[in-house]
A protein has these predicted regions:
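Glycine-rich dinucleotide-binding loop and its adjacent helix/turn
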Residues: 85-91, 144, 239-294, 298, ...
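FAD-site-proximal beta/loop scaffold in flavoenzymes
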Residues: 252-269, 356-431
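Glycine-rich flavin
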Residues: 66, 88-102, 118-125, 130-268, ...
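Flexible, glycine-rich terminal cap/loop adjacent to redox cofactors
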Residues: 107-112, 116, 121-133, 138, ...
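A Rossmann-like FAD-binding core segment of flavoenzymes
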Residues: 171, 205-208, 212-225, 230, ...
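Acidic, low-complexity mobile loops and tails
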Residues: 1-36, 45, 83-89, 99
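Short hydrophobic core segments
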Residues: 105-107, 211, 229-240, 274-275, ...
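Beta1/beta-strand and adjacent pyrophosphate-binding region of the FAD-binding site
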Residues: 95-110, 268-278
């Protein structure tokens, strides 16, 4: 029998086949996820309507399909069709109402929410996960993963252009942004499908819809005419963040993009002006530059990446300038205008003077803010932070309402995916009576510029502000053999020691493999490892990790392969 695509959500006329979860010969049962289907409304699972054996798969990942197309051929029994129209992408028959009483309700399926749900289920809690959009939240769909996919494509393209350094030359290199975006989407789809698989395997019920509080322990979830009233002993709010809005005249002009739009832009501009020199802005600045785009960055603060140490900020500034990226700090954007030729004109004030930059596109990258939209928190006793900047929580992630927790970007502690995930685990442990607290002193942070930047623990400025007596050791990647073979000699490893306590309290890395190396520094600080123990540890050669060993030696006798 032929299994066809019988409907699509919304007004979509066609879709793309995402991750295929089955193989010829597989036996599937009712509601098993066969494919992921991607429409312009997002990603949805295509589930089996009965128990049957897969005889032939007629489509491939990435193939465009439309209603009526045969997706696969199977043998077995299909559940009889209902008289009412059924949406095979997760929607139930319209008008359904259901009352539920459970142990744990998680609102939001980002890296905080879905980890909380899986961890809670593994710990024996009857768990429901609610999500109004795609599984994976901002990080997986329009944040961490898509950005890093583009960063890698840009890096590969730039290396091919500069192959002469490595002894080869490629002529007529052509960049196809449609394929770059398609690769990004495929990676995302695979990961979304993986989350859906894990939820099914852990018997977690996923309800797609928008959640709003009725009272302190009752939540209404609506999608279309379907309504679910859920009463939960414990609720974890994990609704993440949304792009911050800024009042700049002209911000709604058609050539102005936000980060979400930039991640799906299949037409590469010749030039772009980026408003914001923070993490998002600088990651996009380097990836666009590696794609050959002329980039300018306008930053309000007196330096880019103001959250990292000054020497790290200055190092990445020098590298950016060497790549032709224009940087304008201490600059306030006053308006955006459209030129006669349709280009964007960004007007800003700098040192009392009005200046302007002209570019094909403008990217606004000024950060994100907690997303509490539609939750109807006014129906509860939940307290918010000052100026309503997120949900107020204690170190155990509890709100002021017993049984309600808030994790991730929505509590506005630290906007990092790995922080959200760990907060979720701590919350579930506390639900189970373990009385745990979230520790923020040793949270690694990574910025995917070129080269990468990573830091953990206290910064030099924080130590100075706290009057901590410190010693600093730096080891440059220019003295590291592996970095030289990679053609990446810029940057350094920096380690900070508290002389009074006799332990390492912070560190920064700017250079090759920083995103991976930071885990070693995190472990060193978290476990209070002494210099002696680190010095006695054998680091593999040739690796960039040897730089950590050298930097630690620099705190005492001095590095072996570098002499200041």
């Amino acid at each position: 029998m032929d299994i066809k695509l019988e409907s699509l959500s919304g007004k979509s006329k066609s879709a793309k086949v995402g991750k295929i979860n089955i193989q010829v010969g597989d036996k599937v049962k009712l509601n098993d996820v066969l494919f992921q289907i991607e429409t312009n409304k997002g990603n949805s699972p295509l589930k089996a309507k009965g128990s049957y054996k897969i005889e032939e798969i007629k489509v491939t990942e990435g193939q465009e399909v439309k209603v009526g197309d045969t997706l696969l051929i199977a043998s077995g029994e299909v559940v009889a069709k209902e008289t009412k129209k059924v949406d095979y992408f997760g929607n139930l028959i319209q008008g359904k109402k259901e009352n539920l009483n459970i142990d744990l309700l998680v609102v939001g399926a980002g890296p905080g929410g879905y980890v909380s749900a899986i961890y809670g289920a593994k710990k024996g809690l009857n768990t429901i996960l609610v999500e109004k959009d795609n599984l994976g939240g901002t990080c997986l769909n329009v944040g961490c993963i898509p950005t890093k996919s583009l960063v890698k494509s840009a890096e590969a393209y730039n290396e091919a252009l500069n192959g002469e350094e490595f002894g080869f030359e490629i002529k007529d290199i052509k960049l196809d942004m449609k394929k770059v975006i398609a690769r990004k989407d495929k990676i995302r789809n695979n990961l979304v499908g993986g989350i859906d698989y894990l939820l099914n395997k852990n018997n977690i019920r996923l309800i797609k819809g928008e959640a709003s509080f009725i009272d302190n322990h009752k939540v209404l979830v609506k999608k279309g005419r379907d309504e679910y009233t859920i009463e939960a002993k414990n609720i974890i709010i994990a609704t993440g963040s949304k792009i911050s809005k800024i009042s700049i005249p002209g911000i709604d002009l058609p050539f102005v993009l936000n980060s979400t739009e930039a991640l799906s832009n299949t037409e590469l501009p010749k030039s772009i002006t980026i408003i914001g020199g923070g993490v998002i802005g600088m990651e996009f600045a380097f990836l666009y530059s590696n794609f050959g785009v002329k980039v300018n960055v306008v930053e309000y603060e007196n330096r880019i990446l103001s959250m990292v140490d000054l020497d790290v900020s200055e190092e990445i500034l020098d590298i950016a300038k060497s790549k032709g990226i224009g940087i304008y700090t201490s600059s306030k954007v006053t308006r955006i205008e459209k030129s006669e030729s349709g280009e964007g004109i960004v007007i800003f004030e700098n040192e009392g003077n009005e200046k302007l930059l002209v570019s094909e596109k403008v990217l606004v990258a000024i950060g994100r803010e907690p997303n509490m939209e539609g939750l109807n928190l006014e129906n509860t006793d939940i307290e918010l932070n000052d100026r309503n900047r997120g949900i107020k929580v204690e170190s155990n992630l509890k709100t002021n309402v017993e049984g309600i927790y808030a994790i991730g970007d929505v509590n506005n502690k630290i906007q990092l995916a790995h922080v959200a995930s760990h907060q979720g685990i701590v919350s579930v442990d506390n639900i189970l009576g373990e009385n745990k607290e979230m520790q923020y002193e040793c949270i690694p942070n990574v910025i995917f510029t070129a080269p990468e930047i990573a830091s953990v623990g206290l910064t030099e400025k924080q130590c100075i502000d706290k009057n901590i007596n410190i010693k600093i050791s730096k080891f440059p990647f220019a003295a590291n053999g592996k970095a030289l073979t990679m053609g990446q000699e810029n940057g350094f490893i920096k380690i900070i020691k508290d002389l009074d306590l006799g332990k390492i309290v912070g560190g920064s890395i700017i250079g090759p493999d920083a995103s991976s190396l930071i885990s070693t520094l995190t472990l060193i600080i978290q476990q209070n490892m002494s210099e002696e123990r680190i010095a006695e540890t054998v680091f593999a050669h040739p690796t960039t990790g040897e730089g950590i060993h050298e930097a630690v030696l620099g705190l005492s006798i001095g590095a072996i392969h570098y002499n200041e």
